[in-house]
Amino acid sequence: MAVSVKRLINDFDLEVLVEGNEDIKIEVNDVNRPGLQLAGFYNYFAPERIQIIGKAEWSFLQDMQIEVRKKRVKKYLSFNITCLIISRDLEPHEEFIKEARKNNIWVLRSKSVTTKLISKITLYLADKLAPETRLHGVLVDVSGIGILITGESGIGKSETALELIKRGHRLITDDAVDIRESDGTLIGSSPKITIGMLEVRGIGIIDVTQLYGLSSVLEEKEIKLIMHFEHWKDDNDYDRLGIDNQYMDILGIPVKKLTVPVRPGRNIAVIIEAAAVNYRYSLMSKISPVDIIENRMSAVSDEA
């Protein structure tokens, strides 16, 4: 993933002082304040990072002798820098403008204070540059738990989502789930063209937002649980005690997975509701229902 400098300019309302290479992309989510570089130290310098000059760096340059400043700025801007942002609406030294034009480097200016600008850009890039993938499935918010429903086409994922929406839960996306990893969590969202849309066989595509209200759709949700639908197989030994822990790896993060056998007569929406509440219970309780049963059996044995 990469972010163009022009997109950064638009999203942060930055003033363009020098136009640079339009093809250059931002590919790392770290920033650099070049105080050490302007002092002549270039070990471990990362020119691919966004360079931000704040009041401290600006004052340091201001106090330099003109010839020294020209020499330092010339060397600094000889590197293939992605872009340079001057914060606090400070006036750039003319050496910066001259060398930036010569080397085709973007020089931008922001009215924000330096620390806030760095914080906003870091969070912005962490989101935009997060690893992504797209999976086939349906993502719903059930009782506050983000549940990814998977399974082969035609098994009833969308119909189950529709029933959950009718019961007051919320849809994030149907059919295609865009997933990005952000700080160890998985965030699911919908492709732009299908936001709020649900495809139901026999009916067609329905606009969930229009039929069930704005509160029935969410833009994104952290994925906590996977419910995998499969056709009921009589010879399959399905988990009946909740002790068979399965996980699915998405972008290097394991997500708890439950396999739900589907056959006529089973109310799958109710099962998913129960799974969501049970998942929340497992996070809050140190004892499982199986442990409770075993404790009761031990108590009965002791009484006998």
Curated annotation (Swiss-Prot):
It catalyses: [HPr protein]-L-serine + ATP = [HPr protein]-O-phospho-L-serine + ADP + H(+); [HPr protein]-O-phospho-L-serine + phosphate + H(+) = [HPr protein]-L-serine + diphosphate. Keywords: ATP-binding, Carbohydrate metabolism, Kinase, Magnesium, Metal-binding, Multifunctional enzyme, Nucleotide-binding, Serine/threonine-protein kinase, Transferase. The keyword Magnesium applies. The active site is at residues 136, 157, 175, 240. Its EC number is 2.7.11.-, 2.7.4.-. Its cofactor is Mg(2+). Residues 261-266 are annotated as: Important for the catalytic mechanism of dephosphorylation. Residues 198-207 are annotated as: Important for the catalytic mechanism of both phosphorylation and dephosphorylation. One of its GO terms (molecular function) is protein serine/threonine kinase activity. It comes from the Bacteria. Catalyzes the ATP- as well as the pyrophosphate-dependent phosphorylation of a specific serine residue in HPr, a phosphocarrier protein of the phosphoenolpyruvate-dependent sugar phosphotransferase system (PTS). HprK/P also catalyzes the pyrophosphate-producing, inorganic phosphate-dependent dephosphorylation (phosphorolysis) of seryl-phosphorylated HPr (P-Ser-HPr). Both phosphorylation and phosphorolysis are carried out by the same active site and suggest a common mechanism for both reactions. The Walker A ATP-binding motif also binds Pi and PPi. HAMAP family: HPr_kinase (MF_01249). NCBIfam families: hpr-ser. Homohexamer. Belongs to the HPrK/P family. This is HPr kinase/phosphorylase. It comes from Clostridium botulinum (strain Eklund 17B / Type B). The gene is hprK.
